[in-house]
Design a protein with these regions (language model features):
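ATP/Mg2+-dependent ligation/transfer catalytic cores
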Residues: 1-140
Length: 140
């Protein structure tokens, strides 16, 4: 297992999938309400496809309230403009076991549009931009 307790490398995940110890991978991101959301995929599909290509999801997931109802006021997602697709690209530095869900692993994802441009409004994208700004100033 990875250097930190519960953390996994991609190779370790592949081995756990091959032995049947992991059967599900949750590919997740934080929505505008601070909740973890995303997709649950079979571990074999994750290893064979999602790890390299990512997984698509609807941008609706960024723009709903706590009851999963659509909310007015989001320029990127509405009934007027439509609900488009985003790509969740796994960040393997976040790959970890989920001990409270046996047989499962979790990986956080960076969001981009299907044309490859980052989803600037995604909380993780905002955080990464702020971390870059701090690094430019020598603060991290």
């Amino acid at each position: 297992m990875g250097a930190q307790k519960g953390m996994l490398t991609q190779a370790e995940l592949e081995q756990l999938v091959a032995t049947g110890d992991i059967d599900t991978v949750i590919v997740a991101f934080t929505d505008m309400q601070g909740r973890l959301t995303g997709k649950r995929v079979s571990a074999r599909l994750f290893v064979d496809d999602v790890a390299e290509h990512g997984a698509e999801c609807c941008n609706y997931l960024l723009a709903v309230d706590v009851d999963m109802n659509t909310v007015d006021g989001y320029a990127i997602s509405s009934w007027e403009t439509g609900y488009g697709d985003m790509v969740m690209t796994p960040d393997f530095s976040t790959l970890r076991l989920l001990p409270w869900i046996p047989g499962s692993a979790l990986v956080m994802a960076d969001l981009s549009w299907t044309d490859g441009k980052p989803v600037k409004q995604a909380p993780r994208s905002i955080l990464n931009r702020q971390m870059d700004r701090l690094a430019e100033r020598g603060l991290v």
